[in-house]
Amino acid sequence: MPGVFLNEDDYNFDIALRRFKKQVEKAGILSEMKKRQHYEKPSVMRKKKKAAARKRLMKKIRKMNMA
């Protein structure tokens, strides 16, 4: 779990907030929260996963044709 501790000597809230946001982003907490906000049926999850794989494949094919 991300956390930022401040000393009394170097109390700069902006830097601490920036550091905290970076840690949260790296841990993937916000994306996980958005994903779990509503229940998604397993069939819908499989369908989305399959569509994403197809999209990646098409992108890869397009990239190969351009080069």
From Swiss-Prot:
Entry GO terms, CC: ribonucleoprotein complex; ribosome
Keyword annotations from UniProtKB, A to Z: Ribonucleoprotein, Ribosomal protein
Coiled coil feature spans: none
Example GO biological process: translation
GO molecular function annotation: structural constituent of ribosome
Disulfide bridge partners, by residue number: none
Family named by the database record: Belongs to the bacterial ribosomal protein bS21 family.
Protein name: Small ribosomal subunit protein bS21
Gene source species: Desulfovibrio desulfuricans (strain ATCC 27774 / DSM 6949 / MB)
